[in-house]
UniProtKB/Swiss-Prot annotation:
Subunit: Homodimer; disulfide-linked.
Originating organism: Giraffa camelopardalis (Giraffe)
Subcellular compartments: Secreted
A Pfam family annotated for this UniProt entry: RnaseA
Cross-referenced PANTHER family: RIBONUCLEASE, RIBONUCLEASE PANCREATIC
Gene that specifies this protein: SRN
Keyword Protein biosynthesis: no
Disulfide bonds: C10-C65, C28-C80, C35-C42
Protein name as it appears in the record: Seminal ribonuclease
Similarity section: Belongs to the pancreatic ribonuclease family.
Coiled coil feature spans: none
PROSITE patterns: RNASE_PANCREATIC
Length: 84
């Protein structure tokens, strides 16, 4: 999964959420929280979402990047603007 999703790039960390756009947008009407940057337009999801965390391993370099893949669930925080 990680290598296919990161073709053409070799970032140290990539995180991919496995939710529909509608489900992510719905978080904007859930629990309001303070953002890490101090702003007040962040919202936390009521339930956990499925995600995949991809972390570059060792000294692998582009174009042969290698990643450790971890699948998990956690609640997310999103910054919302306007109605989204």
């Amino acid at each position: 999964f990680c290598r296919k999703m990161t073709q053409g790039k070799c970032k140290p960390v990539n995180t991919f959420g496995h939710e529909s756009l509608a489900n992510v947008q719905a978080v904007c009407s859930q629990k309001k929280v303070i953002c890490k940057n101090g702003l007040s337009n962040c919202y936390q999801s009521n339930s956990a979402i499925h995600y995949t965390d991809c972390r570059k391993t060792g000294s692998s370099n582009y174009p042969n990047c290698a990643y450790k893949t971890t699948r998990a669930e956690k609640r997310i925080i999103v910054a919302c603007e306007g109605n989204l």
